[in-house]
Amino acid sequence: MSSTTQWENIYHGLDTTPGKLRMSQGGLGWKPSVGEGSTITIPADQMASFQWIRVARNYQLAIYLNKDRDAPSSAQTNPRRTNFDGFVRDDFDRLSSHIRQYFNKPLEAKEVSTRGWNWGQAKISNHDVQFLVRDKLAFELPLSHLANSNIAKTEVSMEFLNPEQQQPGANTGTSDVNGTKSRRSKGDQLVEMRLYVPGQAIKDDGSDAASAQDDDVNNEETAAEAFHEALKSKADIGQVAGDSIVVFKEVLVLTPRGRYDIDVFSTFIRLRGKTYDYKILYSSMNKLFLLPKADEIHVMLVIGLDPPIRQGQTRYPYLVLQFPREEEMDAELNLDEQTIQEKYDGKLKKRYEEPTFRIVTNIFKVLSGQKVATPTDFESSSGQTSIKCNVKAADGNLYPLEKSLLWVSKQPVYVPYSEIHQAILSRVGGAVASSKTFDLRVATKSGTEHTFQSISREELDRLKAWLADRKVRIKNEMAEETGGLAAAAAAGLLSDDDDEEMGAAGGADEDEDSEEDADFAADSDSDGGSPSEASSDEGEGGGYDDEGDERPKKKRKD
């Protein structure tokens, strides 16, 4: 019977619960000291090499694994490394001795740089991206955690999956309660890193047939491009290794804008464009909408994503695909009938001969497990299922669906009826009653407010009735404005009548005064002092004194 060696207070991966690590001739195992967490076992023949490194939680034993021949070749589905933290410095000799005794392999000690420099050398190994400072390791990132890589001139960005997506097998339970508790206990995590890679790299293609032009043009590439291509190759995030279920070519994606080839795999899809690539797990798809466009020529498939995909600092929580309504295609899935029946319950077909949008929607629906929401009974004044309106400076279409409002443009806005506190109907800036448009302000229970602007006045009754049927609280400020305008108009009419009567009376007095002035020209001095508001105002202004000075001069001439 082989002996067993044990270490206490050892952490596995990113787990916050310590456990016990046991090592024997047949392999090693780890289980948490408290709770009902997963037990990790690694057979001896799967361990390729061992590394000792200083980390935040004392020292780490990194175990590099042999690649499982039966597993898919994607790095994300076949982790190549597992870590155990919590060893103390004095454990090195004991651990090294037992690894050599049980597995006949050395324990390599890796030096760590503590200079704190943010410049150095980026190196890609079979398992990690390593950042070296003076040939010492500053940090390393497992390739199995890398979800995507993009390049912009001399800058290479790397995007990372969250822990649930990195190691789905490490979850301890499947219930919502356990999942919620697990998510709450997690702290900050790395989601993106950018490296500035200047300079040129010479591409060694080993071809003797290359021409002089090829040597000048094709053999040279930037160091950033070489690093980017190496990342894609090692992490399997470019042309994904393995067999895809189906590929859709040159699909127009409105958000983020561009044409992409969509590779469909069993657990994720990959969007491959000219500049950007995206890997999207089906587990991150939480909403599907199939919507007709107002032009009646195209159909949109809107996919809600959580977490959203990223393009630099821009986050895209929705993916908007557009298809011509009449476009059809023949597609054959790379699946056998047994897999379709057993794994997908017969919900997929081996061969499709249908409109493209129906094929894509059906495949995404089955693989993601999400229902597809479509417009139901709402009809606008023009017979459409949507209403044209604006959000801020962007124009788009508002779709009143059965359970939510969905505004589709560059950045869609989704508002479930259950989260609406109040819907407010108002005119633009309190415009007059003849205004042809109005605004819909939606205040949510969380305090967020969405304003859909410049909606045609003809849609008011239909939209109000639709929201009322969904038990949405409605405040119609337009009715209040109309009542206020009516009262103001009535008051205005009354004041206009009074002014006309007073004006008529004032006109008669002026005529009489003018007649008196003509008959009694000699008494003009007394007329000049007659009490009138106009004359008194002019006297206060000083104009009347000038006129009074001229009249006595005329009398002296007579």
Curated annotation (Swiss-Prot):
Chain residue ranges for the region called Disordered: 162-186, 495-558
Residue ranges with Polar residues bias: 163-180
Transmembrane spans: none
Gene Ontology CC entries for this record: chromosome, telomeric region; FACT complex
Protein's UniProt keywords contain Isomerase: no
GO biological process: DNA repair; DNA replication-dependent chromatin assembly; DNA-templated DNA replication; nucleosome organization; pericentric heterochromatin formation; positive regulation of RNA polymerase II transcription preinitiation complex assembly; silent mating-type cassette heterochromatin formation; subtelomeric heterochromatin formation
UniProt KW keywords: Chromosome, DNA damage, DNA repair, DNA replication, Nucleus, Transcription, Transcription regulation
Xref: SUPFAM superfamilies: PH domain-like
Top-rank taxon: Eukaryota
Biased composition (Acidic residues): 495-526, 535-549
Compartments in which it is found: Nucleus; Chromosome
GO molecular function: DNA binding; histone binding; nucleosome binding
Matches recorded under InterPro entries: PH-like_dom_sf, RTT106/SPT16-like_middle_dom, RTT106/SSRP1_HistChap/FACT, SSRP1-like_PH1, SSRP1/POB3, SSRP1/POB3_N, SSRP1_DD, SSRP1_sf
Family classification: Belongs to the SSRP1 family.
Biological role stated in the UniProt entry: Component of the FACT complex, a general chromatin factor that acts to reorganize nucleosomes. The FACT complex is involved in multiple processes that require DNA as a template such as mRNA elongation, DNA replication and DNA repair. During transcription elongation the FACT complex acts as a histone chaperone that both destabilizes and restores nucleosomal structure.
PANTHER family linked to this entry: FACT COMPLEX SUBUNIT SSRP1
Subunit-structure text: Forms a stable heterodimer with SPT16. The SPT16-POB3 dimer weakly associates with multiple molecules of NHP6 to form the FACT complex.
Name this protein carries in UniProt: FACT complex subunit POB3
Organism name: Mycosarcoma maydis
